[in-house]
Amino acid sequence: MTQKNTLLLIDGYGFVFRAYYAQQPLTSPKGEPVGALYGFTSMLLKLLSDFKPKHVAVVFDSGGKNFRHQIYPDYKANRPPPPEDLIIQLPLVRDVASNLNFPILEKNGYEADDIIATFATKTAALGAHVVIISSDKDLLQLMTENIKIYDPLKGKYITEDDVVKKFGTTSDKLREVMALIGDRSDNIPGVPSIGPKTASSLITQFGSVENIFNSLDQVSSVKQRETLQNSREAALISWQLIGLNSNVDLDFQLNNLEWSPPNSDKLTGFLQEYGFRSLYKRVENLLDIKINDHKEIADSKVTEIKELNNANELADFAKEATKIGIFGIYLLQHKGANLAFILSLQNQSYIIKISNTSHDLFSYNTKSNNNWFSDIIFNLLTDKSIKKITYSLKPLLKFYANQSHDITAIEDLELMQYALSAGLSQKNLFKEVLKETWIENIIIESAKIVINFIALYKQTIWELKDNKTFRLYSNIDLPICFILDKMEKVGITVDANYLKQLSAEFGTEILKLEEEIFALSGTKFNIGSPKQLGEILFEKMQLPFGKASAKASSYSTGAEILEKLSEHGYNIADLLLRWRQLTKLKNTYTDSLPKQIDNITHRVHTTFLQTSTTTGRLSSQEPNLQNVPIRSSEGNQIRKAFIAEEGYKLISADYSQIELRILSHIANIDALKQAFINKDDIHTQTACQIFNLQKHELTSEHRRKAKAINFGIIYGISAFGLAKQLNVTNGEASEYIKKYFAEYKGVQEYMEQTKAFASSNGYVTNCFGRKCFVPLIHDKKLKQFAERAAINAPIQGTNTDIIKIAMINLDQEIEKRKLKTRLVLQIHDELLFEAPIDEVEIITPIIKKIMENSTNMAVPIITEIRAGNNWMEIH
């Protein structure tokens, strides 16, 4: 079968549905679900590759009712609607075919099967060959010498033997057999209790459904005869429904279905719009076209990669960069070591290898003889008239240590991309390159990427402005990067001797706990092994609630199980919970923090991650100083280890109930707004309403529960989750939530509107216009999780940007006043400063004023400020 005389007919929606269920959920750069579109595109490309057709068409159902519904109104009535995230994609599937230049066939009132039948039979009548691409059994009726069925699921042509094996009859009799069997998926009734074996036997004997009913007295089985007699109408209707109409009134011109390569620009735009970059290579190789995509830059062709080996060569580059006014720069790092500076200008890339590969933040000597390039590059970085384009700015800032604040006119592509699409899969430009094992390859391949920095910048800056997120990037994300770099370099002092003492105390109690645990269990074992612990608790000791984990083939010994055992009076559970708490504190903090004290600064230096969350919220690592415990006495003891340098005080500035204030503002909740304007205690007010008590009747427990309800609602907590948190029944928790929504009218409406917006758009926005994408909103299994995230994201995201604005304004004010106060940590709602003792009274009102006036809201923003010698004192 050659392509010259073959027509390829593709069952469009059959392919789309198959693609949807075969493909993991994917989202476009705009947050829209595109998994089915991606799979459909990939499948069509495979068909082009495998069949290389001259004539081809994608055939679609027109939707709505057709002539079969006139015959049988309940036709397909039992079919559930497609999944919500597939429905969104269906109007776009024709774009896929169109952009690949596939002709499209459809006609109102007819199904794709009928259109396929019409074109297949007419084409075959001309002596040409037809290949139908479908897994639909109904189309097997069309099989002839010239009409073949190719099943893409099985990757093979269907033969007559396959049909006989499955249905007990040949393709020309399939309609007769199927009329008796019926088709549950299409709600075609058939004849009750007649399956494939009986149906094929009857058709073999009588030849057709009509002949059966004309010769009912010859049916040997009395029961079958009665069943058929009672189902005559159903069988004849089924025969009509299953048959294919091969005479649909269509303009049959085979030449109109001739395939030609698609328009390169049009196809490129389509692939870019939906983020199908992984298909670029296939498209280029298959269609012999070039896709010019600014984001797929690792494979770009570089005119020249040149290594600069001396100051004269670099000076020539600097002259050219000054003349042009823009260049790309990237500090390439690998496994903590600085490998090279890579510069780009016009169509060239320049490499400066770094001989000193120390990854110590403070030991890199920019004045070393080996660093002949340092001053020249620094002069370029500090020249306001030259724009610099980089990716991941902080390593560059660290390289120049205390001089980094002079770097100006620089743009960070990583931060620009984050401002565009926080929450979507961030494509690190250098991720694949850094998987290389040969250093020389890493440098060369990175140089190929850097050559495209300027083009990528121009495209991304346009996208930022088009999406109205440029100000977020330029006013918040970029300046905060400089401040985070400064904070990381400053670090915070930790009392190593105190931690050593605390670690010893924890260790003593841990040993004592282990002895008690072993005594109660009657044996020694590895307490840290969930498998061994499960066997001891639920096999040796025969305690209740033992539940085997299917994945691990061992008992579950999580906190929930131990707490349940504790509630039922099993002392060993209390000991185990305490043991886990102390060992975690010891391993995570008291033992490890002293090891992370820098040898030169004698301080701990965390790393702040700016692009790791969907809401813009900062995170911290190596060590994580945002999760230092606060609610337990032991956690507070660890906070005591964070101390002010001699002659300084620590100052904590903490936003009070900021997320509830933001909720009152964005959801316009009058009761909440009035409470904050009146400076009422919001948790007390909630407690009064929930528990139907007067203020003087409330206990601290009432307020604690009200606080949990207030903040739980923000995070979309369920009745089950609240019940567990408050240790009440599900019914009580449901009643609390119901009363909360009644008291604070508008909260529930805000939540429903936010979920609906997220479902329609794939993202939500905070008060500053930052888009927080929720790509899992259409995932059936994770929908509820995504909805909770969508509810909270505008609140948390607004909170995050408020505190970032405060940090930027405070940094400017401190610089302006030439104060020695320094910002050392950001812990979500809290800023931690280190101030000289004689500046505490000066800086405190400045901090309060700036933090409380970072933005305008319908309610006042309140900041609580405390100063002390250590972090525990000020909480």
UniProtKB/Swiss-Prot annotation:
InterPro entries membership:
5-3_exonucl_a-hlix_arch_N (IPR020046), 5-3_exonuclease (IPR002421), 5-3_exonuclease_C_sf (IPR036279), DNA-dir_DNA_pol_A_CS (IPR019760), DNA-dir_DNA_pol_A_palm_dom (IPR001098), DNA/RNA_pol_sf (IPR043502), DNA_polI_H3TH (IPR020045), DNA_polymerase_1 (IPR018320)
Record GO terms (molecular function): 5'-3' exonuclease activity; DNA binding; DNA-directed DNA polymerase activity
E.C. number(s) listed in UniProt: 2.7.7.7
Q: Which reaction does it catalyse?
A: DNA(n) + a 2'-deoxyribonucleoside 5'-triphosphate = DNA(n+1) + diphosphate
Keywords for this entry? DNA damage, DNA repair, DNA replication, DNA-binding, DNA-directed DNA polymerase, Exonuclease, Hydrolase, Nuclease, Nucleotidyltransferase, Transferase
Q: Which GO terms describe its biological process?
A: DNA-templated DNA replication; double-strand break repair
| SMART domains the UniProt entry points to | 53EXOc (SM00475), HhH2 (SM00279), POLAc (SM00482)
| Alphabetized Pfam families for the sequence | 5_3_exonuc (PF01367), 5_3_exonuc_N (PF02739), DNA_pol_A (PF00476)
The chain positions of domain 5'-3' exonuclease read 1-283
Mind telling me which PROSITE patterns this protein's record contains? DNA_POLYMERASE_A
Q: How does it assemble?
A: Single-chain monomer with multiple functions.
- What does the sequence similarity comment in the record state about its family? Belongs to the DNA polymerase type-A family.
Q: What does this protein do?
A: In addition to polymerase activity, this DNA polymerase exhibits 5'-3' exonuclease activity.
- Could you identify this protein by its name? DNA polymerase I
Q: Which species is the source of this protein?
A: Rickettsia conorii (strain ATCC VR-613 / Malish 7)
Q: In the UniProt record, what gene is named as encoding this protein?
A: polA
